[in-house]
A protein has these predicted regions:
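Non-globular targeting/processing and membrane-anchoring segments
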Residues: 33-85, 99, 106-109, 113-264
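Intrinsic-disorder-associated, low-complexity terminal segments enriched in Asp/Asn/His/Tyr and depleted
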Residues: 2, 10-11, 21
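Short glycine-rich or small-residue beta-strand-to-loop segments that form or flank ligand, phosphate
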Residues: 85-91
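Sec-dependent bacterial lipoprotein signal peptides
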Residues: 15-44
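Intrinsically disordered, low-complexity segments enriched in small/polar residues
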Residues: 8-9, 17, 134
């Protein structure tokens, strides 16, 4: 059934002139009222999803971010196929989603392998940003890992029209933890939600290759430092829920220190 167009609305927000790190960071995420899309998915989620997700009383009523925009919402990690569950829900038009894909890919690459990652840009002019942001294209991509179960879903294309859908379990989780429908929605290691701790302004004027070079540089500038700091925080969150594997990643002193900050 055609879910109909996605109506886009936004949080009133102020983009800080200095887009540095903070524990709460810049909260703004694009809000999408998914019209028939989320409504239809929510109906489909009734049934087996509840037993998979489990009790919801562990979700805090207040949003307090433990570190770098990452907050624990479940004490016991939610598992899919025996592995800690990670879910990225975004939209191709969304500048915050475009910015979040960089640390997400860097962190997840430490636990498995992406295949088919493409390149794309967010939509220029969205959410007050008069520029587009180069980023990864998750639509043609897949991910395999011996430690994690990961799914990426882009629910809207560059024009805000429906693209990919969530399955029942994903919809139940999304609607429960993110009832306003804000994207990017990033559920990490079956236990955490993560928000972007820096502004998309940080990526302004950079090409895809320039951002990739910054992220992989041994002496990164402010852009690479911000992305890598979030990648490390996501890595630590994953390590706390997957048995600290692989040891070559989770045993690194910097990651160990972050794990202690995120421990329940």
């Amino acid at each position: 059934m055609d879910a109909g167009p996605i109506a886009i609305r936004y949080h009133p927000k102020t983009i800080a002139a200095a887009y540095g790190h903070s524990e709460v960071g810049l909260k703004p995420r694009v809000l999408i009222a998914m019209a028939g899309l989320i409504a239809a998915l929510a109906l489909a989620a009734c049934g087996s999803a509840a037993s998979t997700i489990g009790a919801t009383s562990a979700v805090p009523t207040a949003t307090v971010y433990d570190f770098n925009g990452i907050h624990r919402v479940y004490t016991s990690p939610k598992l899919i196929q025996g592995h800690a569950w990670t879910l990225f829900v975004g939209g191709q038009f969304c500048p915050f989603c475009a910015s979040m894909r960089w640390p997400f890919v860097k962190a997840l690459s430490r636990f498995g392998t992406f295949s088919g990652l493409g390149e794309m840009h967010s939509q220029k002019g969205v959410d007050g940003f008069d520029f587009s942001i180069p980023t990864y294209d998750f639509v043609p991509a897949s991910y395999t890992s011996p430690y994690l179960t990961v799914r990426m879903a882009e629910v809207a294309d560059a024009n805000g029209k429906p693209l990919q859908t969530l399955d029942d379990d994903e919809t139940d989780l999304f609607n429960h933890l993110d009832p306003n429908g804000a994207i990017p929605f990033v559920f990490v290691g079956g236990a955490y939600v993560a928000q972007l701790p820096y502004s998309p302004l940080l990526l302004q004027g950079h090409s895809y290759s320039q951002i990739a070079a910054e992220v992989n540089s041994e002496t990164p500038g402010p852009l690479g430092q911000a992305i890598n700091a979030e990648a490390d925080a996501l890595t630590a969150a994953l390590c706390t829920t997957d048995g600290a594997q692989p040891a070559s990643v989770c045993g690194q002193p910097a990651i160990q220190a972050l794990m202690h900050r995120l421990a329940p």
